[in-house]
Amino acid sequence: MKKERTESLVAQALKNIGNDRYKLDNLVFARVKQLNAGAKTLVNMDPKRHKLVDIAIREIAEGKIDIDRIDERN
């Protein structure tokens, strides 16, 4: 996995959800709750080595998580 700057990941995540920062905050929060409860990561990142927020942002930036998918899991 190539290293990317946090700013570029956040920019891509915002783009994927329509540039709505409020929606991104809610989506990251919901996904972090899932990861904290034991959900498997959808990207190749170890939760023991990376912050859950970073994992959630990468999942959103890569298009693996969106609002509909979060709603299904809750």
Swiss-Prot record:
The catalytic activity of this protein is classed by the Enzyme Commission as 2.7.7.6
Q: Which domain of life is it from?
A: Bacteria
**Which Pfam families did the record assign?**
RNA_pol_Rpb6
Molecular function via GO:
DNA binding; DNA-directed RNA polymerase activity
What does the entry give for GO biological process?
Answer: DNA-templated transcription
> What does it catalyze?
RNA(n) + a ribonucleoside 5'-triphosphate = RNA(n+1) + diphosphate
Keywords carried by this UniProt record: DNA-directed RNA polymerase, Nucleotidyltransferase, Transcription, Transferase
Q: Does the keyword Transferase apply?
A: yes
The record's listing under SMART domains reads:
RNA_pol_Rpb6
Might you report a single GO cellular component term?
Answer: DNA-directed RNA polymerase complex
Q: Give the quaternary structure.
A: The RNAP catalytic core consists of 2 alpha, 1 beta, 1 beta' and 1 omega subunit. When a sigma factor is associated with the core the holoenzyme is formed, which can initiate transcription.
Function, as annotated, reads: Promotes RNA polymerase assembly. Latches the N- and C-terminal regions of the beta' subunit thereby facilitating its interaction with the beta and alpha subunits.
Similarity section: Belongs to the RNA polymerase subunit omega family.
This chain belongs to the protein called: DNA-directed RNA polymerase subunit omega
Q: Which organism is it from?
A: Helicobacter pylori (strain P12)
